[in-house]
Swiss-Prot record:
Naturally occurring in which organism (per UniProt): Koribacter versatilis (strain Ellin345)
Protein name as it appears in the record: UPF0102 protein Acid345_3985
Signal peptide: none
Alphabetical list of SUPFAM superfamilies matching this protein: Restriction endonuclease-like (SSF52980)
Domain of life of the organism encoding this protein: Bacteria
Record-stated family: Belongs to the UPF0102 family.
Record-level Gene Ontology MF annotations: nucleic acid binding
Amino acid sequence: MRVFTQLAVRLLDAILPEPDEPEHLKTGRRGEELAYFFLRKHGYTIVARNFRTPWHKSELDIIGWNGGILCFIEVKTRTTRDIATAEAAVDDTKRNDLRRVARHYLRQCAENTPTRFDIVTVYLDRPKPEITILKSAFLLSGE
């Protein structure tokens, strides 16, 4: 399975990046691909990626089920650990943006669907990427 994941990521790296794409966008895209496979390996059923609405600038990187909980997952990728942690980039403003988009997504779900927001951090500063999940990083209600 590990070999398949590595091959899939290499294939996606070859297909997805555009030559003129800024380096930080390439890094983010690679992190999201790694997070996608990592989450699947850890039991998540992915139902959407890069979900946007016409009314909000933010997007939900990954949406998936973990058990009976619908998870809205923000992926943060870093190539260095010199500054703040990756999860620190999900500040109050970003959280509120993600909540707005999640509420829009929830309009198509059953009422009272259990939800949570997870943050996946991806560090690419070592030969093997380091990926972690922070489950229930914040709530839909804004608490």
